[in-house]
A protein has these predicted regions:
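An aromatic- and histidine-rich active-site surface loop
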Residues: 69-82, 86-115, 277
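Short alpha-helical donor nucleotide-sugar binding micro-motif in glycosyltransferases
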Residues: 253-254, 261-266, 285
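Short hydrophobic beta-strand element within catalytic cores of glycosyltransferases
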Residues: 291-294
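Conserved donor-binding/catalytic core segment of Leloir-type glycosyltransferases
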Residues: 4, 184-217, 223
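Short, structured helix-loop element that forms part of the nucleotide-activated donor/catalytic region
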Residues: 47-49, 221-247, 258
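Aromatic "clamp/platform" in nucleotide-sugar-dependent glycosyltransferases that forms part
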Residues: 274
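Membrane-proximal helix-turn-helix segments that form the acceptor-binding/catalytic region
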Residues: 79-82, 128-146, 155
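N-terminal strand-loop element at the rim of the active site
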Residues: 8-14, 28-65, 152-158, 228-230
Length: 295
């Protein structure tokens, strides 16, 4: 089959959960003999990169703005996919649901992976929240199939929209390699640091984690792994709160083998998110057998 994946920043993954999902899904589909194209954003993947591990990459522009980045790129991706006549398309993020009509209208079957309850995120103004609620409803109407990644999200769509969805839980790739020298790059010792991984946005409660850790009397360190492209003020506030406590270390985004080394050598993992879907980082921490503290 010829399959298109739309609605993420693209692959190779170096941002968040949907990108990690798209990379794992696309490469596994290719390994099974399918022809897969992942649509990527030009400020995230080089336009010169045409392929990744057998997956075709189509890099398109977008408008780099908090409210437009995702939907503009998904719209352009859907338009580009029409003449390609894919056998199936997967759209990530309920925000992109309106564009399912473009593909279905030209005969391409469409599934949407809706993610979490984005309308509850504080980063959106009232108009953004209203749009997300509309897009949620459309994600139960326009595609051929609505996909949820957790039972609680499946139950939400059933209760709010009386909509059936297919729940497909994420897995985690666990490869144990005691790569201890890697973690020392961040001035930590194996099994002597607490790991927090997330996009640094208010609903993921990095502020709460930092303030709680500051009250703990311990020589262990806190590694804050993550970033966010449109949350500079919030991130600066986090770093200001951590100022003076040398135990708290901000790493930015970490992916690949370095990230896996951080997971498998952590003393424990802290999960403090409120409104997202299933976070791959949580599953990976569980897969590595980490002690997990949840909000």
């Amino acid at each position: 089959m010829r399959i298109a994946i739309l609605g993420t920043r693209g692959i190779p993954a170096s941002y968040g959960g949907f990108e990690t999902f798209a990379e794992h899904l696309s490469t596994r589909l290719v390994a099974r003999g399918h022809d897969v194209t992942v649509y990527c954003r030009a400020h995230y993947v080089s336009p010169r990169q045409l392929e990744s591990h057998g997956v075709r990459l189509k890099v398109l522009p977008t408008i780099r703005h908090k409210y437009l980045d995702t939907v503009v790129h998904a719209f352009l991706s859907a338009l580009h996919a029409v003449p390609a006549r894919f056998d199936a398309a997967l759209i990530c993020n309920a925000a992109n649901a309106p564009f399912a009509s473009i593909l279905r209208g030209t005969g391409t079957p469409v599934a949407i992976n809706v993610d979490g309850l984005e309308h509850k995120r504080k980063k959106w103004n009232w108009l953004g929240r209203k749009y997300y609620l509309l897009a949620e409803r459309l994600s139960t109407i326009l595609p051929n199939e609505t996909v949820t990644d957790a039972c609680v999200i499946q139950d939400y769509y059933a209760a709010k929209y009386n909509a059936r969805s297919t729940m497909i839980a994420y897995g985690a790739e666990v490869e144990r390699k005691p790569d201890r020298p890697v973690v020392r790059r961040w001035r930590v010792e194996p099994n002597r640091y607490v790991l927090y991984v997330s996009r640094l946005e208010p609903e993921n409660n990095a502020r709460m984690v930092i303030e709680a850790f500051k009250k703990v009397r311990t020589a262990y360190r806190l590694l804050v792994v993550g970033d966010a492209p449109y949350a500079h003020e919030y991130i600066n506030d986090l770093k200001e709160r951590a100022r003076g406590d040398r135990r708290i270390i901000f790493t930015g985004f970490v992916f690949g083998q370095d990230y896996r080394a951080l997971q498998q050598n952590a003393y424990c993992y802290v999960h403090a998110t409120e409104v997202g879907g299933t976070h791959p980082a949580l599953l990976e921490a569980m897969g590595f057998g980490n002690c997990v503290l949840t909000l």
